């Protein structure tokens, strides 16, 4: 049941971004790779990605084309991490200053082994301690953004990253072209080696064991809570009035449709406990009724 499609494609024109907006995409995501101009040009000596300015200004063109939810990121390890960190924050500051909307998400990938890449050939790799500090500092500096960490990181690293400020993680990812169409993971075309190879069910159970509420919510996009409206709700903290019950309702859907018996049992207990903590009594009652409908009547897609 796909309710939101985020798009990660190379930098393009305002006209093409407008087409994506008209098609109803969610967030447009593009990583800078490196903010260091000389390093960027050395890594992209030819081809359509060679133009540093065209790539760096992609989010400005995306917003000009009407896309107000954008996701940025930098590949830590290509250049000095302090420079990349500063560039990332300056990019976020620029988007908010010029367009009134900062990045909807910030991703923090770091250089990892891949089919034709040996990370030891690069001199600017960062260890787990520095990586955790970067995550914490981004969270402090850009408190409204969603922070993403992928399965290129291990379970141990992802656990610590969650406590440092990560709010979105992937599970059962496939990084090869057409990877989700195959029963077995095709390693020969993977973008990077997957370190956390647990199933989505295992990741969901793990998150609940750690005290988190796994959320599959897509409500903001469909309710028009994007761009500057989303920013205002996030900065004031009011977004939690929607996020909490929506997380519980979407978790109930996942548990009913996809979870193992063990995960479903744990999740239903968590939902029962969390429902009682919703401060607004009316919202608590409505959320509870919707969750019961999910369990008993096979109804879906409730959200505030």
Which sequence ranges carry the predicted segments?
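Glycine-rich tight-turn/loop motif centered on a GG-T
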Residues: 1, 40-52, 118-127, 187-193
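Radical SAM/AdoMet-radical enzyme domain recognition
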Residues: 1-75
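Mobile, glycine- and charge-enriched loop segments
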Residues: 2-8, 21, 26, 130-151, ...
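Residues that cap or flank secondary-structure elements
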Residues: 8-9, 50, 126, 149-150, ...
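Short Asp/Glu-rich motifs
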Residues: 16-17, 39-40, 81-83, 180-181, ...
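Short low-complexity, flexible loop/linker segments enriched in glycine and/or proline
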Residues: 21-23, 43-47, 84-88, 183-187, ...
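Conserved C-terminal portion of the radical SAM core fold
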Residues: 27, 32, 53-117, 127-156, ...
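Radical SAM enzyme core and accessory elements
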Residues: 156-167, 173-304
């Amino acid at each position: 049941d796909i309710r939101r499609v985020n798009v990660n494609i190379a930098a393009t024109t305002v006209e093409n971004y407008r087409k994506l907006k008209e098609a109803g995409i969610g967030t447009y995501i593009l990583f800078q790779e490196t903010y260091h101009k000389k390093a960027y040009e050395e890594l992209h000596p030819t081809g359509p990605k060679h133009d540093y300015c065209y790539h760096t200004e992609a989010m400005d063109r995306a917003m000009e084309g009407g896309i107000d939810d954008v996701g940025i990121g930098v590949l830590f390890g290509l250049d000095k991490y302090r420079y990349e960190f500063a560039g990332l924050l300056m990019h976020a500051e620029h988007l908010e200053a010029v367009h009134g909307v900062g990045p909807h998400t910030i991703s923090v990938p770091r250089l990892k082994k891949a089919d034709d890449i040996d990370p030891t050939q690069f001199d600017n790799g960062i260890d787990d301690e520095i990586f955790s500090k970067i995550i914490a500092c981004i969270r402090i500096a850009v408190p409204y953004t969603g922070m993403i960490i992928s399965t290129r990181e291990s379970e141990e690293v992802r656990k610590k990253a969650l406590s440092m400020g990560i709010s979105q993680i992937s599970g059962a990812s496939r990084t090869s072209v057409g990877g989700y169409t195959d029963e077995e993971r095709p390693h020969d075309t993977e973008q990077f080696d997957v370190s956390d190879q647990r199933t989505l069910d295992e990741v969901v159970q793990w998150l609940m064991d750690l005290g988190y509420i796994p959320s599959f919510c897509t409500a903001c996009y469909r309710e028009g809570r994007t761009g500057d409206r989303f920013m205002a709700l996030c900065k004031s903290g009011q977004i939690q009035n929607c996020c909490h019950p929506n997380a519980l309702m979407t978790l109930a859907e996942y548990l009913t449709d996809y979870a193992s018996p063990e995960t479903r049992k744990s999740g239903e207990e968590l939902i029962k406990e969390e429902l009682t903590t919703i401060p607004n009594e009316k919202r608590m009652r409505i959320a509870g009724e919707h969750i019961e409908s999910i369990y008993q009547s096979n109804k879906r897609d409730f959200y505030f």
